[in-house]
Every structure is written in C-alpha cells, then in structure tokens.
Amino acid sequence: MLSAMDVMIHSSSFLLPCDETCGTRYALVVLNQNLPRFTPLLWEHAKLRLCADGGANRIYDELPLFFPHEDPFVIRNRYKPDVIKGDMDSIRRDVLDFYVYWGTKVIDESHDQDTTDLDKCISYIRHSTLNQESSRLQILATGALGGRFDHEAGNLNVLYRYPDTRIVLLSDDCLIQLLPKTHRHEIHIHSSLQGPHCGLIPIGTPSANTTTSGLKWDLSNTEMRFGGLISTSNLVKEEIITVESDSDLLWTISIKKTGLPVQDHKP
C-alpha cells in the first residue's frame, strides 16, 4: 500500500444542523424518486438547488407533506429550485409552469440522450461559480437510489465519471459515495445518525489490496472482486474509519430512522 498518499476526509455533516457543517459548500440535486425525510435539512444546507427533470414533481408534491400544518402554497414558494435541468420528459406541465412563474431557471437538454439527468446536473454544478473552491464542494443527490436498477446503475456510474468531485447519493435508508484510489480515506462517523451497517464494494475493477481500520471485520491487504469477496453487511466499530485501496471503492453506510431532524427551517 502507498502510505505517502494524501488523506481525504469524509463526514456526513450535512445530516447535522446548518451551524455544524464546517464550511463545506453544498449543492443539492433532487432526482425523481421519493424524497428522504431529511430533504428540507439538505435544502437549508445547499447554496445551489437543482431538480433533475421529474425531481421537480417530487419537490412540488412531497415537500408540503413534511409540513402538514402549513399551507402547501407557502411551502412550495419556500422550497423553489434554482434550476430544473434534464430531458424534460417527466416533469408535469403544471409543475413546470409554477416554477417558471416564480423564477426558476429551466434548461431543456432533450437533445442529449447520451447522459443521465444526474450527469447533466453534475456538469452544470461543476461549471457554476460554486465550484470555484472545488475542494470545499460536495454534491448531494436525493432520489438516486431505489426504483429501477438501470437508473441506479446510471447514477453509480456518475460517481466514476467524476472521481475528482465529491458526490453523495442518498436515500431514506443509506448513502453511497466513491472512495478514489488516489487517496487514503478517513471517514468520520456520526453514530447517532448513521450506521452501524456499512460496506466497501469494488465495481468495474477488482481490488487486489484493500486495508481498513475501525470496522468489525477489517480488511488487511485483502483482495475483493465480484464473484469473490466483497465487504457487505460489515459494521462500524470506531468513530473514524480508514480505508486504503489500489482500486476505486464504493462506500455505503446506513442512515438511522431516529435522531435526524426532519427540517431545519426557522420561520
């Protein structure tokens, strides 16, 4: 293993109240799957909010359900995306008209059928002013997991297309992110919010050599590949997990159902 590698530090501070995020600049992408219960909190963290095509339907329909004692119109005005981008084959006309009326930028890329809607949104963020300090940028994608498997596979592929950009795929149950082989990794665990179940998975390229610390079943110069050993259903044991590998790996960890604030809005 290459002990001289730079260390990349990972933290799910976006699951904490906004005053505890340590300067990270977040962008949020909402895809066309059920919204996690903590979506309003992610929204408050984000400096830029995009809906990928039908993700706008989810914001319009589902966010008011998180605030049953407030007027849905008020909620829809509070949570307006900055940009709607995609091939525009899923967004409803009434939803599109609503957000256009209230000033959301709409980018129709129906001419591009070679990239996914998530890919289109990531590209937009990478070319935005938010990416001027790229080391501090983290992109959060909700609705990236669940539903059709080919959609999930396409979203996982986006992580590999942009290994130099910190992207986290989120569902109500877990998160997934890429650990590039170019770095050693320190993953800081918020045990009240996430875990204990976790996994390290090589996709595309086998790992001949992976070493970890902080897991119940640590790896020590271990080979991992599909058709052989992969580290699934592992358990977090320490507050800091370290990972070093000769291959890009996917890191996944469960998100607990309790302990998370549903929203961080201050009227």
Curated annotation (Swiss-Prot):
Its main location: cytoplasm. Expressed in leaves and at lower levels in flowers. Disruption phenotype: No visible phenotype under normal growth conditions. Tpk1 and tpk2 double mutants exhibit a seedling lethal phenotype. Optimum temperature is 45 degrees Celsius. One of its GO terms (molecular function) is kinase activity. One of its GO terms (cellular component) is cytosol. Its EC number is 2.7.6.2. Pathway: Cofactor biosynthesis; thiamine diphosphate biosynthesis; thiamine diphosphate from thiamine: step 1/1. InterPro entries: Thi_PPkinase (IPR006282), Thiamin_pyrophosphokinase_euk (IPR016966), Thiamin_PyroPKinase_B1-bd (IPR007373), TPK_B1-bd_sf (IPR036371), TPK_catalytic (IPR007371), TPK_catalytic_sf (IPR036759). One of its GO terms (biological process) is thiamine metabolic process. It catalyses: thiamine + ATP = thiamine diphosphate + AMP + H(+). Catalyzes the phosphorylation of thiamine to thiamine pyrophosphate (TPP). TPP is an active cofactor for enzymes involved in glycolysis and energy production. Plant leaves require high levels of TPP for photosynthesis and carbohydrate metabolism. This is Thiamine pyrophosphokinase 2. It comes from Arabidopsis thaliana (Mouse-ear cress). The gene is TPK2.
